[in-house]
């Protein structure tokens, strides 16, 4: 099949049909046919492949783990990771610690922040229940990618405390404060017990619950 593809390398339209009929990947199986199209589909896919080689997907899946608890977090890439990461700070801006009046706080609140949609109950037997979510966002800066989301997490580990610790490790790694959904108290109590409640932002008044 590879030889067949090579024989059509100078004919993008025919190559596209060969790829569609004998795909190597799921994406290839769902390619559009050249029939009835006003555009040169073969050339379009050829350009897409070229662009992907020039600019590979910047998002990496993986998990944050403690290399040394409460001292250093590392990121471990894995295809089934719970985190999707598009950007990381330079090594000297990772795992930075800060104290205010003896309390651990996020050192880089001016660089970015995170939003958390948590849950309080462990996974049910039938697997129902919404996922926990975390997004980390870079604020405007001239020194790093700005005004963009850099981390996405949408998963529901069997134990809620695994989710809480995932969120804590990510916040520790980036040094960003977190805004937690106001009716979820489990994660707040967890951060307090771990000594990291200084990483939690006060909820803006205009987002408070109506009385």
What are these regions (language model features)?
Residues 1-203:
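RNase H-like, metal-dependent nuclease domains and their acidic two-metal-ion catalytic environment used
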């Amino acid at each position: 099949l590879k030889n067949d593809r090579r024989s059509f390398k100078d004919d993008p339209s025919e190559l596209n049909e060969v790829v569609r009929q004998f795909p190597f990947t799921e994406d290839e199986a769902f390619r559009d046919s050249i029939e009835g199209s006003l555009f040169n589909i073969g050339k379009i896919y050829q350009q897409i492949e070229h662009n992907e080689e020039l600019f590979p997907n910047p998002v990496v899946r993986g998990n944050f783990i403690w290399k040394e608890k409460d001292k250093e977090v590392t990121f471990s890439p894995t295809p089934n990771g719970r985190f999707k990461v598009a950007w990381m700070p330079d090594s000297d801006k990772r795992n930075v610690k800060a104290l205010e009046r003896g309390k651990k706080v996020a050192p880089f609140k001016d660089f970015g922040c995170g939003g958390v949609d948590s849950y309080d109950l462990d996974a049910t037997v039938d697997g129902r229940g919404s996922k926990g979510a975390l997004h980390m966002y870079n604020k405007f800066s001239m020194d790093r990618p700005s005004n963009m989301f850099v981390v996405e997490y949408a998963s529901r580990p069997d134990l809620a405390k695994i989710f809480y610790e995932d969120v804590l490790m990510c916040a520790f790694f980036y040094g960003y404060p977190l805004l937690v959904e106001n009716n979820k108290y489990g994660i707040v109590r967890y951060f307090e017990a771990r000594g990291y409640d200084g990483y939690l932002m006060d909820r803006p008044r205009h987002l408070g619950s109506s009385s």
